[in-house]
Structure formats: C-alpha cells, structure tokens
C-alpha cells in the first residue's frame, strides 16, 4: 500500500500538472535519512532546511511529523537551466527522544520546452537540494 507521503506527493504533482499546462514531471524518488536527534529537533531541522531552500510549504502537520512543499522556479532563470525546475517534496519525520528518521519523497517538474534537458538538469537539481537538506538534518561531525 502506498505511504501517506507518496499519495500526497502524487496528488500535489497532479494538481501542479493538471492546473498548469505545459509541464513535465520526473519520477518520484524516495529516500530515508537517519537523524541523530529527537523527533522534535529533526522536525525543526527539516523546516529550517526547507525554508533555507526557499520551499513554499503546502502542508505543515507537526503533530504527525509531515511536511509537504514546493520550491518554485526563479522568475528570471533561463529556460534549460536548473533555476527553471520545480522541486516537489513530501517529508515524514518519525522517531523518539534520542533518534529520528526522515523519509523523503521528491520529484522535479519543469516546463514542457525543457523536456529534452529536464531529466538531466532537473534531476541533478533535485539531488543537490536533497543533499543540502540532508546536511541540515544530519550535519557532519565537527572537525
């Protein structure tokens, strides 16, 4: 059975694609990140990371540890560049007072005119955004 975050991400992507003609979307990609912090701290880190990455939050449900958001493209980005890619994300935070797990489901959405470049350009942008979010969730040890 699909997870709640997968269903919400699919509905959000469908709304984006159905409400806006001329868009293409990449596949949904799921990932899990262990966080060496309490569930509440992991949720705060997730929100901070999403704010830093300029995500517009669509759903914020802290009682269930669920966040859904979209990072919209830059208004002045050139067609064919990563700045024209949307990143759609759904995050579920689970854990206890000592450790947490953040399950993330992401996909890219791009203008139809980028259909030839989007699988490479936008997927790289999606991966880069997720890498930066993971650094906020579980920072490397201080040297």
Could you say what each language-model-derived stretch is?
Residues 1-9:
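Bacterial N-terminal signal peptides that target proteins for export
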Residues 13:
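Soluble catalytic regions of membrane-associated enzymes that act on cell-envelope
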Residues 21-143:
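Ser/Thr-rich, low-complexity intrinsically disordered terminal regions
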Residues 16-19:
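C-terminal motif of bacterial Sec signal peptides marking the signal peptidase cleavage site
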């Amino acid at each position: 059975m699909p997870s709640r975050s997968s269903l919400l991400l699919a509905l959000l992507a469908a709304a984006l694609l159905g409400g806006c003609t001329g868009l293409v979307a990449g596949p949904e990609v799921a990932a899990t990140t262990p966080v060496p912090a309490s569930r509440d701290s992991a949720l705060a880190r997730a929100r901070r990371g999403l704010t830093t990455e300029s995500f517009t939050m669509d759903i914020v449900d802290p009682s269930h540890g669920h966040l859904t958001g979209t990072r919209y493209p830059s208004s002045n980005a050139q067609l064919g560049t990563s700045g024209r890619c949307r990143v759609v994300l759904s995050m579920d935070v689970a854990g206890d007072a000592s450790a947490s797990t953040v399950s993330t489901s992401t996909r890219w959405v791009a203008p139809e005119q980028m259909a030839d470049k989007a699988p490479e350009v936008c997927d790289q942008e999606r991966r880069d955004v997720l890498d930066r979010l993971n650094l906020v969730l579980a920072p490397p040890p201080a040297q």
